[in-house]
């Protein structure tokens, strides 16, 4: 059982690290030029299909975290750390569904709106700043997983 616990936690850490890599890449390479020139740059959204990455990474993260939680449930120290990560992740997913994704959809459709480029710029910059905050929370949520790895289970 110890091996399964450790392997599941290692898998969750790898998946989480992959998500963090996607966050950094998106925020350093993709979003700055895309959000700086809306609505003119809205056509860039058709050139990148990052949804396949995110629609794979997030279910893998959810499954790996739940499996890790189940396998480590009897180990209180690990369980609590894994639950911290899950709680932060749940808040991030909810805010993503309620704010970030709808705004991205609005950005994609910005060429057909009556909103001025100046207003799109402000919305894009606000979105990006808030998304950096969301990303920081995702990094913070990684720390408990790493600490759980360090917990003695033998």
Locations of regions flagged by a protein language model:
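Interfacial segments of alpha-helical transmembrane regions
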Residues: 2-17, 67-92
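Short, charged juxtamembrane terminal tails flanking transmembrane helices
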Residues: 2-3, 150-154
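Interfacial loop at the N-terminal end of multi-pass membrane proteins
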Residues: 4-65, 104-125
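Structural signal for membrane-spanning alpha-helices in multi-pass inner-membrane proteins
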Residues: 23, 65-72, 96, 142-149
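Membrane-interfacial segments
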Residues: 38, 76, 111, 153-154
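Core segments of transmembrane alpha-helices
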Residues: 57-68, 135-142
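Hydrophobic alpha-helical transmembrane segments of integral membrane proteins
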Residues: 87-108
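Histidine-centered, metal-coordinating catalytic motifs and their short helical/loop contexts
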Residues: 124-133
């Amino acid at each position: 059982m110890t091996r399964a616990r450790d392997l599941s936690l290692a898998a969750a850490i790898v998946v989480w690290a992959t998500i963090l890599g996607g966050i950094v890449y998106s925020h350093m390479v993709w979003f700055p030029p895309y959000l700086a020139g809306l609505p003119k740059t809205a056509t860039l959204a058709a050139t990148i299909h990052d949804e396949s990455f995110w629609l794979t990474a997030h279910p893998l993260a959810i499954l790996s975290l739940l499996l890790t939680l189940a396998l480590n449930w009897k180990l209180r120290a690990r369980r609590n750390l894994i639950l911290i990560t899950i709680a932060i992740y749940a808040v991030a997913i909810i805010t993503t569904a309620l704010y970030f994704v709808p705004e991205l959809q609005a950005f994609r459709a910005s060429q057909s709106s009556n909103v001025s480029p100046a207003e799109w710029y402000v919305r894009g910059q606000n979105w990006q700043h808030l998304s950096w905050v969301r990303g920081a929370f995702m990094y913070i949520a990684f720390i408990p997983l790493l600490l759980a790895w360090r917990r003695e289970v033998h």
